[in-house]
Regions:
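C-terminal amphipathic helix plus adjacent low-complexity
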Residues: 151, 291-354
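A nucleotide-sugar donor-handling region in carbohydrate enzymes
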Residues: 107-191
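A short helix->loop->beta-strand "cap" motif at the edges of active sites that frequently abuts
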Residues: 97-101, 203, 264
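A donor-sugar binding/catalytic signature common to diverse glycosyltransferases
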Residues: 24-27, 233-281
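Catalytic donor nucleotide-activated moiety binding site of glycosyltransferases and closely related
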Residues: 200-231
Length: 354
């Protein structure tokens, strides 16, 4: 029987809760599989709504600053998204009789460099980690990357989901024939175009906290569109929201991945970067996602996504045809599900299988 491992997972909450969302899902999946996780956070406030029932058995949430006083380091140490580990903790890593697996978990991207960079090592020749080697783990969409987070039973849960019952329990009452759309967004000038985009059919827009709820009250709504504010949702309930809706507007990384597992049409708002690197990242994903799509669907999707992300003017933008978009979402999910999930690959990466 293989020994239970101890995992140290470090995350700095930069903004918008995307980093902590990814790390919390990983911590939960590790704990559910019997591993011990110490999650080191510089700001755990978001867990009050992301995980309202508290940390499950196997997860210990600790303040970042306390890592400098930790007595020992775990078997696996993950620094998420390039956060720099405290030097005293790195020294604890170097002091272990058996060096820990030191992993830099990178941001998700479909760009070509990901396949080239996945698995590369960075030997430490100086400093407190001298003698250790850090390795880079890149999530991605191909077999030559680290894959996507997908917990066991996720697709089965989505397939057996009772949307009407869940919506009723949340106080959401769509009218007969009304489309359900969810909205999770960063500040976005294109948001003012959304009511007109949705106006071609009756729509109930479910707005997540933050930018959507600040901006929507100031927008004129067509007679066919109404909106409802949502409270902060736990990760599990956010998944259910995506499953229940016909169309999902998502942002960043965590909700972007979950929208793909929902198997529903979605529109992605990528995290904007000052050097416009996000434009290349967006196009790289669309190139892969739409490679086998119907040409008409591909054209409409590219135009909408680029306009939604402020990369092209909002001129004659329409939603892709719903049936074609749904078929594309299902086909893409099936393709992704044929690849090993991220945790399976991460375990193989550090020399543990199963």
């Amino acid at each position: 029987m293989m020994r239970r491992k101890t995992w140290d997972l470090f995350c700095r909450v930069i903004d918008n809760h995307g980093d902590i969302g990814v790390c919390w899902r990983l911590a939960r999946q590790l704990a559910a599989s019997g591993e011990a996780v110490r999650l080191w956070l510089d700001d755990a406030a978001a867990l009050s709504w992301m995980a309202p029932d508290g940390a499950p058995q196997g997860i210990e949430v600790l303040p970042w600053d306390a890592a400098a006083r930790a007595e020992s380091a775990g078997d696996v140490v993950i620094e998420a998204f390039g956060c720099e580990l405290p030097a005293p903790f790195i020294a604890r890593m170097a002091a272990r009789a058996e060096a820990p697996a030191w992993i830099n978990l990178e941001y998700l991207s479909a760009e070509s460099y990901v396949e080239r960079s996945h698995g590369l090592a960075s030997p430490q020749f100086s400093g407190p980690g001298r003698g250790l080697s850090k390795r880079f783990f890149y999530p991605g969409f191909t077999l030559r990357t680290g894959g996507l987070p997908r917990e066991p039973g996720l697709l089965e849960a989505a397939g057996s989901f009772d949307a009407p019952a869940w919506l009723q329990a949340q106080g959401i009452a769509p009218r007969p024939g009304e489309r359900l759309a969810s909205l999770f967004a960063y500040p976005n000038p294109a948001l003012q175009q959304l009511p007109r985009l949705l106006a071609e059919r009756p729509t109930l827009l479910l707005a997540c906290p933050g930018t959507p709820q600040r901006e929507l009250p100031g927008l004129a709504m067509p007679a066919t569109v109404r909106w409802q504010p949502l409270p902060y949702l736990s990760q599990d309930n956010y998944d259910r929201l995506l499953w229940a809706c016909d169309l999902n507007f998502v942002r960043g990384e965590d909700s972007f991945v979950r929208a793909q597992w929902a198997g529903k049409p979605f529109v992605w708002q990528i995290y904007p970067q000052d050097d416009d690197a996000h434009a290349h990242k967006l196009d790289a994903f669309m190139d892969r996602w739409l490679a086998a799509a119907d040409p008409g669907l591909a054209t409409a999707s590219r135009r909408l996504w680029r306009a939604w992300n402020g990369l092209t003017p909002w001129t004659d933008i329409t939603l892709p045809e719903p049936c074609a978009a749904q078929a594309q979402a299902q086909a893409w999910r099936t393709r992704l599900a044929g690849q090993p999930d991220q945790l399976t690959q991460l375990r193989q990466f550090i020399g543990k299988t199963g």
